[in-house]
């Protein structure tokens, strides 16, 4: 067997020998030559679609990755998986499909690669669920693989982005701006291709994946348009051939230490609460034990230093302009915050990758020094108490305060809550409770971006809190707590809260409680009846039957 045959572990089973003549005939029709049958096959999973600006350019990046694979002596084969648009679906029934799409992306990458016999993979993602979906798919297959991020969008006119539009809706409801002004913001906020422009979920997860070692250095911090992203895609296609030669696979890279690095980088960047959910799910895919407690312990020793939206003032494109996250990671490594001995897709360790990285330019204030942090410990606060015995996730930078106490205003679902905020039913001093939005109860664990944006737009950001068994967009800010477990559909305490109950959220003690006795909660539980799901067939019904708790990453293969 030749060295090249050693690199064809999977494709050789599909196309070698006289018995495989039908398979070769099919491949000749899509462009294979005699010479191509002797090459390793690199699958290139593209999430291209015209349903969202996050992904509208990824077809071109897939072609670059194919060129890179071919230039390195492999044969690149492009295939597509799906994407949805959180920005379009938020606030609607369609958002129930968002988290489901993470599983569909992972499943489809596994299905196509397993069927076709690709020897290695490049996956390219743009919108939020693409990133964890691609990583979970690659992790399950455990073949030499690299992730490429589609890149960030440019700011809209007046330093606007998609969150500017969501919050304009609330400003209009308050009477601060006219419908014409809302339309003016709407028309300029999204100027072209790329993922949403703050440290929202897409940029958070791309940064986490780079810190994890599963993308090439710099991939998370490049504009969607321009030469850097095309080059990143080409080099990824080339590098998979090197990973094949090294036999370096996702499980060699996605180790416990690598996940700790990813968590600490997410914290430094003030990243999205969705990172908790997705990192738990990605760890599950490689059998790395990761729990909410790990976020607690690492959070105690990890400062927030990035002044990025939604909590800060800068956009991702401004971080790109000063060097991206590589200088931050170099600072963190030098300060002993990262494990430098972990392997990455370069074939080198993280420390080796960062050895020659220059620091940020003098005078920039996007990334602060560690001795002048925005917050000395994590903004991702894991809360427990009689309202969430299995844990909840809050994003608290300190600007919102560290404690909130108020009376419950309860809604069964997002739509009622949004209406209550916009029509003035929600009053200062209240805790908005949105329940039956968990992974099973929604189903799909919708993001509460429309309600949180309405809260901010109505000027209630410091006057109310919002808690839910659903999730939040990376663009949400304010005093918000999500991922409450057990969820309402499972009979968790959030299902037992009544209007007027006193709720206390304390980030310093990491507690979330309802001021109701155990006896009263027990009595309410006897009267509680699980609502019947309206989904009896199809993907949402299947998802609700198989999905795990949010505290376990909301995965669908944990208890099979």
What feature does the model see in each segment?
Residues 98-107:
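Glycine-rich, highly charged phosphate/nucleotide-binding loops
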Residues 2-56, 61-80, 87-88, 93-98, ...:
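Catalytic or ion-coupling anion/metal-binding cores of large enzyme and transporter domains
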Residues 113-134, 146-149:
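A short, small-residue-rich loop immediately preceding and capping a beta-strand
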């Amino acid at each position: 067997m030749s060295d090249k045959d050693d690199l064809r572990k999977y494709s050789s089973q599909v196309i070698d020998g006289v018995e495989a003549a039908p398979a070769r005939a099919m491949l000749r029709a899509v462009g294979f030559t005699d010479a191509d049958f002797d090459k390793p096959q690199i699958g290139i999973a593209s999430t291209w679609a015209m349903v969202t600006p996050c992904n509208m350019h990824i077809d071109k990046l897939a072609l670059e990755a194919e060129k890179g694979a071919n230039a390195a002596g492999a044969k690149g084969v492009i295939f597509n998986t799906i994407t949805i648009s959180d920005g379009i679906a938020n606030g609607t029934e369609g958002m129930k499909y968002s988290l489901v799409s993470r599983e569909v992306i992972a499943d489809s990458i596994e299905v196509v690669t397993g069927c076709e016999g690709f020897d290695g993979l490049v996956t390219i993602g743009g919108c939020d669920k693409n990133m964890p979906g691609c990583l979970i798919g690659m992790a399950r297959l455990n073949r030499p693989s690299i992730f490429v991020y589609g890149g960030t969008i440019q700011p809209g006119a007046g330093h606007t982005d998609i969150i500017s539009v969501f919050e304009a809706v609330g400003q209009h409801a308050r009477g601060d701006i006219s419908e014409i002004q809302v339309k003016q913001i709407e028309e300029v906020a999204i100027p072209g291709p790329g993922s949403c422009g703050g440290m929202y979920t897409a940029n958070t997860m791309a940064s986490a994946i780079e810190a994890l070692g599963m993308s090439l250095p710099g991939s998370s911090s490049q504009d969607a348009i321009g030469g850097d992203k095309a080059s990143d895609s080409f080099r990824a296609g080339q590098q998979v051939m090197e990973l094949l030669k090294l036999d370096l696979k996702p499980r060699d890279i996605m180790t416990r230490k690598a996940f700790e690095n990813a968590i600490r980088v997410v914290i430094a960047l003030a990243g999205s609460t969705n990172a908790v959910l997705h990192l738990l799910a990605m760890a599950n895919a490689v059998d790395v034990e990761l729990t909410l407690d790990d976020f607690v312990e690492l959070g105690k020793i990890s400062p927030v230093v990035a002044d990025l939206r939604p909590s800060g003032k800068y956009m991702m494109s401004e971080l790109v302009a000063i060097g991206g996250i590589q200088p931050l990671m170099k600072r963190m490594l030098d300060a002993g915050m990262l494990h430098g001995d972990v392997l990455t897709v370069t074939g080198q360790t993280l420390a080796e990758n960062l050895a020659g990285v220059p620091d940020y330019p003098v005078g920039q204030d996007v990334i602060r020094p560690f001795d002048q942090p925005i917050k000395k410990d994590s903004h991702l606060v894991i809360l427990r108490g009689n309202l969430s015995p299995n844990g909840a996730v809050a994003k608290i930078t300190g600007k919102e305060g560290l404690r909130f106490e108020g009376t419950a205003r309860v809604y069964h679902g997002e739509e009622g809550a949004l209406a209550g905020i916009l029509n003035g039913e929600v009053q200062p001093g209240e805790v908005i409770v949105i329940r039956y939005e968990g992974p099973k109860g929604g189903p799909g664990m919708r993001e509460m971006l429309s309600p949180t944006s309405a809260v901010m737009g109505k000027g209630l950001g410091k006057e109310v809190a919002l808690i839910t068994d659903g999730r939040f967009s990376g663009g949400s800010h304010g005093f918000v707590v999500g991922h409450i477990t057990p969820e309402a559909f499972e009979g968790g305490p959030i299902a037992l809260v009544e209007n007027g109950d006193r709720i206390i959220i304390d980030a310093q003690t990491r507690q979330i409680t309802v001021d109701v006795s155990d006896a009263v909660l027990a009595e309410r539980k006897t009267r509680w009846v699980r609502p019947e799901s309206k989904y009896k067939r199809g993907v949402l019904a299947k998802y609700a039957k198989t999905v795990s708790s949010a505290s376990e990453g909301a995965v669908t293969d944990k208890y099979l």
